[in-house]
C-alpha cells in the first residue's frame, strides 16, 4: 500500500467528521489509519481548533468545528480545480 501524505489524512479526518462525530476507533477505521497512530493526527487538528473532543453517552467522540468546516470547504474548492484523472 502506498503511503499517504499526512495532509491527505488530515483532510480525510475532517471529511469523516463533516458527516458526523465519531469515536477514535470508528474514526481510525473510516480513515484507514492504525488506531495507535490516530492520536498523532487528531492532536494537531484539535490544537488548531479544527476539531474538538466531546463526551457523548459516556464515550469520547471528535467533532468538526466551524473553523474545521471552513478549512474542509476551502480544501474541496482547491481539490476540484486540480487536473486529476
Language-model features, listed with the residues they occupy:
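A short acidic, leucine-rich amphipathic alpha-helix
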Residues: 26-30
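A short, conserved structural fragment
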Residues: 46-56
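Basic, amphipathic "hinge/linker" alpha-helix immediately C-terminal to the N-terminal HTH DNA-binding motif
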Residues: 57-75
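Short amphipathic alpha-helical interaction segments
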Residues: 33-47
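Short capping segments at the starts of secondary-structure elements
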Residues: 18-23
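Amphipathic alpha-helical dimerization/coiled-coil segments
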Residues: 73-85
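Short alpha-helical segments that sit at the start of domains
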Residues: 1-12
Amino acid at each position: 500500500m502506498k503511503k499517504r501524505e499526512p495532509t491527505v489524512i488530515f483532510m480525510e479526518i475532517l471529511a469523516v467528521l463533516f458527516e458526523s462525530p465519531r469515536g477514535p476507533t470508528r474514526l481510525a477505521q473510516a480513515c484507514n489509519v492504525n488506531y495507535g497512530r490516530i492520536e498523532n493526527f487528531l492532536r494537531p487538528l484539535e490544537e488548531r481548533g479544527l476539531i474538538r473532543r466531546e463526551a457523548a453517552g459516556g464515550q469520547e467522540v471528535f467533532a468538526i468545528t466551524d473553523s474545521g468546516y471552513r478549512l474542509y470547504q476551502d480544501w474541496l474548492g482547491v481539490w476540484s480545480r486540480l487536473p486529476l484523472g
